[in-house]
Amino acid sequence: MAREVKLTKAGYERLMQQLERERERLQEATKILQELMESSDDYDDSGLEAAKQEKARIEARIDSLEDILSRAVILEEGSGEVIGLGSVVELEDPLSGERLSVQVVSPAEANVLDTPMKISDASPMGKALLGHRVGDVLSLDTPKGRREFRVVAIHG
């Protein structure tokens, strides 16, 4: 049996939107490829080869998204008492007062550019957060080095 992929509801919806965009891109790439094939006298044309490669990349991305979504299990919102998959966690550096907001998600949803930053439960930081409660102080490896943070709030 294929392994399930745990996703938040928002993550599932985001991947569905990506799949729809990729399907639209595939239609456009197929159209361009057909036009190039019809107008090309030489099948070794580099433009034709590039179009074939782009179409193959899009098809691979669609296959990947369809695979993830077919195995998806949407997480129920947590109690907010203990950090788990899907939890949005507010952290505070006790020394500087700096605050950091992260959401613990599955690797399929991880994206450090999102706000809040979506970190994988399989990452060192994600693993360190799981199971903690408000008030707990934990040591995390961050891009700025090892730092201590206090769990200020847990949502979901």
Curated annotation (Swiss-Prot):
Subunit structure: Interacts with RNAP.
Gene: gfh1
Description of its domains: Inhibitory activity is regulated via a pH-induced conformational change of the structure. At pH above 7, Gfh1 is in an inactive flipped orientation that prevents binding to RNAP. At lower pH, Gfh1 switches to an active orientation, which enables binding to RNAP and inhibitory activity.
PROSITE patterns: GREAB_2
Example GO biological process: DNA-templated transcription elongation
Pfam families attached to this UniProt entry: GreA_GreB, GreA_GreB_N
Binding positions for Zn(2+) per the UniProt entry: E20, E24
Name assigned to this protein: Transcription inhibitor protein Gfh1
Listed SUPFAM superfamilies: FKBP-like (SSF54534), GreA transcript cleavage protein, N-terminal domain (SSF46557)
PANTHER family attached to this UniProt entry: TRANSCRIPTION ELONGATION FACTOR GREA
Gene3D superfamilies the record matches: Transcription elongation factor, GreA/GreB, C-terminal domain (3.10.50.30), Transcription elongation factor, GreA/GreB, N-terminal domain (1.10.287.180)
InterPro entries, A to Z: GreA/GreB_C_sf, TF_GreA/GreB_CS, Tscrpt_elong_fac_GreA/B_C, Tscrpt_elong_fac_GreA/B_fam, Tscrpt_elong_fac_GreA/B_N, Tscrpt_elong_fac_GreA/B_N_sf
Keywords: Coiled coil, Metal-binding, Transcription, Transcription regulation, Zinc
Its biological purpose: Inhibits all catalytic activities of RNA polymerase (RNAP) by partially occluding its substrate-binding site and preventing NTP binding.
The UniProt record lists the keyword RNA-binding: no
Coiled coil, from the record: 1-74
